Amino acid sequence: SAPYYDDAATKEYNRLNDTNDSVFVMRYFAETANTGNYGNSVAGNLNMDPSGQTVDAQLFFDPGWNQYMYSNTSGRDLHYDAGAMLVPSNAALDYWWNHDGKVLQNMYGSWDNVPIKVLVKMMNINMINTFSETVPSKFNNIVDNTTKVPLGVTTSDVDSCFMGCNGVIYLTNKVFTPADYSSVSFPALVNQNTMSVIYWAIENLNFEPYLNSMDSYYSFITPTNNAMLSYVDPCSYAASKTVLYTFFYDDKAKTVKAHRYYYDLDSGSIDTSTSLSDATGDQVKDRLEDLLNGLIIVGNVEDGHSYYKSKGGSPIHVTNAGVVGSMTVAGGLQLERSKHVIINKIYDQSENGNGKAYVVDDNIPLTSKRSTYNILQKDERYSEFFKLLDGSRGSLISQKLSGTYSCVDYNISLFDAYNYTVYVPTNESIMKLITDGYLPTWDDYEKLTVDDFGGDRKAYNNGRNTLADIITNFLRYHIQDNSVFIGGNIMNNVKFETSKINPLNKRFFSLTVNADDNSLSVEDQLGNMRNVTKQSGLYNNIGREYWFQVSGSGTSAVDQIYNASDVVVNQIDGPLFYEQNQLRPWRAVIGLSTNGAKLSKAGRK
């Protein structure tokens, strides 16, 4: 709280008392407070002190103001309701401080040393903005203000009740604490000196309710402020020079900002000779939101596997799980460069909370810079599948989304801000399909002429369209929703949808996947069982496809991540089929002679 000068009150006081003095009003920093003057109350957000500096923390509402109720409801005022507060007795607070609150006592020593940013979490959970809905018979309506889960208040928890002019005080014999104190985000909250950047993102980008949920178990990779100096901007992947963001917390403005520099990924050197503008506020939020989605893993990374999917769908590779100093994590970017990030400390919040926080100090696990197109193009062992995909520009792959958003090279247009698996049959198996006359190539498509159809242009156009459909449908059936890995979650006959729609029921054809720590197999609609080729560079190839929104140009260009899709590419030992009709010669399908085409039982090899 702080005293604020009130000009209207000063004038009225001096008029009534024929004097020349100044009147100040004590106000609490609060999300709902009086930001007006004497005689003209205005409900607003009071987040600045009298000198204009942004404050560290705010109460839920101003308990010293009589009109905080119904500030936005026409025709209602404080006479219709009041607020309430759960206030623990001194004895209850002392007991909590020496038992469940011991972690704060050990960290800060005394109540006076606990930062207001930490204390306000407890204060706000005990501030209730409606008394009428939380009378003793309705105590189950009192919930955590972030998770909306009931606090479990009972009448036996209340020793006394005191009525004030603007609300009610329930004196309690126990302390009700927020989910923040049990959450995997708690280490970031209480270590503001070293983790203020990531906690600002948690608090301001709406991750607090998610991480406070006690219904899930989280493994939260928590970067220190030092680690946040090494964020490689994915929006620069399409540019000639990579850009590095160095995030920092501006204590005066109480917000996170970022300097930007050109950066050499290979050498790790920062180019300070070229002046780049600092990131805008929107860019900071955009990058931090994407980063946080990649740092939160729903589940226990110490359960014995190697690959885990983050909240956003990006994979994280884990080694030596649970061992501080030797445990490592790696995102797609690290895996592409054969690097990893060491876990420096582990905070265990699992006993009374919702998981563990894994602290990284030297770097951050970052997402891949490779698209599916890039992964396939760079490895000759994927060449036949790549030729088919490359020929489908404009239908399955694109450089533009909605004519507005750009990408690194080519993105698969079927992807939609989710995670996927692309199964790539071996070159030999695809070539056999082509040689046997079952699968056309784009060369076959281009070589079709009207004369092949006796001059019938309609038949010619239909033939070309059918040929394109045969190729693209073959590709579509090899693209599956959900990324699956060797070394990821164990799967037993789990069905996943592909990108190929069954025209009969308008549902997507499925694949059946079996996977463990050593192998992965996939079964198609015809019962063919294909195995992932477990050779270096042919499985668990991680990629990410971004759509960027760019305005401006040069060093002052403002770019945003519009959306991103994660992908893993796995080679399989044979093609996948969704229907028997795919094993008809394509020339016969479009009404041409099959003379010269070698035909065989390709589907059962």
What does each model-identified segment do?
Residues 1-605:
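Mature, structured domains of secreted/extracytosolic soluble proteins
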